[in-house]
Amino acid sequence: MIELAQIQRIAKKPLEQVLFDMKMAGLETIPGGGAEVFSDRVQSDLFWTKADSEEWLRIASIAHQCGLPSNATMLYGHIENSEEKVYHLTRLREVQDETSGFLAYIPLSFHPERTELEHLPMPSGCLDLKEIAI
């Protein structure tokens, strides 16, 4: 999703026009990455250079309204807490209720090696199973 914001800036066109052009060129779905976790706290601590949660959700909604379904993702296993994960899922659910545009929910496990958070343990298999079960 966040790549679409960059394409829009470079093209200097409205997002709807960018999506229309991409659809006419053969785009059928959008991967939906870059959501990370919808939390202002996490965003400001870890992902401050990326588009924020509201931008991601706005792009997803517009893409779905333009007839381009997507996946929904959440990056887990870093500094997020349970409440932030529930909030993330709730926001995804709201967009899904409005647009019916998400094809799949994909939980993505954080890999801390070679990052500022390499002191954190890898998410456990148990946590992976819990996230998938959601």
Task: Put a short name on every predicted segment.
Residues 40-42:
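Gly-rich Lys/Arg/Thr-decorated short loops/hinges at beta-loop-alpha junctions or inter-strand turns
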Residues 20-35, 54-116, 127-134:
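Conserved C-terminal portion of the radical SAM core fold
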Residues 2-14, 45-50:
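Active-site mouth loops of central-metabolism enzymes
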Residues 44-50, 119-124:
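Short glycine-enriched, charge-decorated loop/helix-capping segments at active-site entrances
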Residues 4-8, 77-81, 122-124:
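Short, small-residue-enriched loops and turns at beta-alpha junctions
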